[in-house]
Amino acid sequence: MALENLTLLVNGRQAFPEIIRCIDEAQTSLEINMFIWRDDRIGNRMAQAVLAAADRGVTVYISVDRYGVVLEKCEECKRSFFHKEQTLTEKMKSRLLEVFYPENTQPGAVKDEHTDLYQRIMAHPNIRVSADVFKADHSKFYIIDDRILFLGGVNIEDKENGQDLSGRVYGDYMARLEGEEYVRAFREKLATGRDTLEDVFFGLNQKEPVRRFEMEELYLDLINGAQQELHITMAYFSPLEHFVEAILAAHRRGVKVTVLIPQRANFQNDSNRRTICQLLKGSNGGIRVWLSPKMLHTKLVMNEKTISFGSTNITKKAFNQLDELNLFVPNDDSEFAKAMLESIASDIRISQPVTAPGEVEYNRLIAWLEGFMV
């Protein structure tokens, strides 16, 4: 199967119009699995497209993890499209998490409304919604007519479609895979854990129907398998000892290692900085580290042979607790791979290089607390 059937969508400004276009053309079925779905402009635009599809007879299934309500209510507009009420425990967790965000520009307490659009979706006979189940499912994907699959790291929220309330431009990726064979392979992976394609495969953390957590090992395989180049762009990058050592070992065997993280992450900023300080110190500045002015929500690990991106951060929680989903594709001369390499190069061109640990400041206590939490 040719990689021409794959399209890279860089950030929400490319992804959302394409996803909505495909929903507008859906004829039989639509499945959406989402971590965060806010009651904001893009959240309502997506909901309108879903409702229109259901009105013309498309069968719709939406799963929005209950886990996400804590994050939906602790930043940005603080309005959730599907989670209209919080338990006392969820409210307390949201208030606690607010402490760990570097900027406090989001509004105060906001009451969610049962909007007309929300009520029409919840009452529609062609739409089934699962929003109250706590699955700890961080993956994001859409399946349309069992023929088109979108997956990646983009939640349904305005900040992914431009910038957040602190002015940080968001960077992220989705992939569009067209062809019934891709959807069949994806469903087979979800059901049995088997990989059935030769040119691409799906990396999965999954608790049901059988617990399969493979993303930690797959990331380490990419790092340990690098012989020439290793690139990591990571939104939330914890200083896990075995990952730091694997990256340093790659540097010691002559691999060109580059790491790109947000200059001001919306969360886990101090933990991110602690990680790059360890990498810079351990390599005597030999590892090339860049701080992006964007809020890179990306989760990308790439060597000279393989590119992987999706929903999986390098954190304890991602590897041990959360359902995650990544796409693995060849790093070859395909248009998909070329688009990814150009996107990475474009991000690096506007980023600030860091060559020594002393150039990076962070709060050790906050970094420790962030590491404890995630």
Spans of model-derived segments:
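Charged, low-complexity intrinsically disordered terminal segments
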Residues: M1-V374
